[in-house]
Regions:
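Extracellular beta-sheet-rich ligand-binding/adhesion modules
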Residues: 1-285, 290-299, 303-306, 311-323
Length: 323
């Protein structure tokens, strides 16, 4: 079992042996730990010789940066490159981040389907950038991503991120502890490993902005903001969740929910009250806010519970279109 620990004792260079405990650079199947007591962040030679790691863990209390701030032609080279295609039976295959620096840019170069991705916390970002930013190559496999707390950008600035399932937040516990909270941005370059639409987004708390197509959104709590003219194949909205059809209408780009299953919660078209489409809906209970009456409803809109269990606000003197 090879556990390799970053110290950053002399600089932020990943290829300097003096920056690793006992001078041991990572090797294939190693478990890399970035501890709270590291002297420097990981900020140079970010495309270090690629080895297939089994895990990469940025521990709580690490306050330094990973990667550097850059844009334009230098953007892609500002990320730390990490391959998580290794296997090691002694410890689980895992990416875990709980550092609190104001910038961590990480590029997943390879992965396995068994590698879990967990964001337990982040710092607060600077200069308008989320604290943790993740992108990837076109991957053959990828584990699910769980985000509990912090600021996370998936596929920033339109970059690629291959992942099938994203889980954000956690509900209140039975002991009365409050739910976790995260702020997540899902970019237009996020898609499934097979290059189809993102398969599932499950949200229990926090706020998530979505700029890509999604097969299924399960919204149990927190807020989901659709910020582009994308398509959601199925939206399952439960008590405690708020779904905002927030994108402004643009030519040839009208946000569409192909099937709404309203079990509770609130669907709203208030932030940018422009034309959007709900092709089909099963309405059990909940609230729909469309004060400018800009939603177009398909003819497969069905009350599954009592009509009085669904609260509508279409504004005064409106004509509602069911096509």
């Amino acid at each position: 079992m090879a556990i390799v620990t970053w110290t950053g004792a002399t600089s932020g260079s990943l290829t300097t042996t003096g920056n690793w405990l006992d001078g041991a650079l990572p090797v294939n199947n190693a478990h890399v730990i970035v501890p709270s007591w590291a002297t420097n962040g990981m900020t140079s030679n970010l495309n270090w010789p690629e080895v297939a790691l089994s895990s990469f863990h940025v521990q709580a209390g690490f306050t330094k940066n990973i990667g550097v701030s850059a844009s334009g032609s230098s953007f892609a080279n500002s990320f730390l490159e990490v391959s998580l295609a290794g296997t090691n039976a002694d410890l689980p295959q895992r990416f875990a981040y709980e550092g609190t620096g104001n910038l961590a840019r990480i590029h997943i170069k390879a992965s396995t389907a068994n590698t879990s991705y967990q964001v337990l916390n982040t710092g607060s970002g600077a200069n308008g950038h989320p604290a943790l930013q993740l992108m990837s190559d076109d991957l053959a496999a990828m584990g699910d991503i769980l985000i509990l707390r912090g600021e996370v950008s998936l596929g920033p600035e339109g970059s690629l991120l291959d992942v099938d399932n994203i889980i954000v937040g956690s509900p209140p516990t039975s002991t009365g502890l409050s739910s976790s909270s995260a702020r997540v941005w899902i970019g237009s370059g996020v898609n499934a490993v097979d290059d189809s639409d993102l398969e599932t987004l499950t949200v229990s708390s926090g706020t998530v902005s979505v700029d890509c197509n999604v097969d299924t959104i399960n919204l149990h709590g927190g807020n989901v903001l659709q910020t582009s003219g994308n398509v959601v194949t199925a939206l399952n909205l439960y008590t405690g969740g708020v779904y905002e059809m927030a994108n402004p209408q643009t030519t040839g780009s009208v946000h569409t929910v192909a099937k709404l299953n309203l079990y509770g919660g609130t669907l709203t078209n208030e932030r940018n009250p422009t034309a959007k489409t709900i092709t089909a809906a099963d309405l059990y209970s909940g609230t729909i806010l469309d004060p400018a009456a800009k939603l177009t409803w398909g003819d497969s809109t069905v009350y599954k519970g009592k009509a009085t269990d669904v609260n509508f606000d279409f504004g005064p003197n409106r004509t509602i279109r069911i096509t």
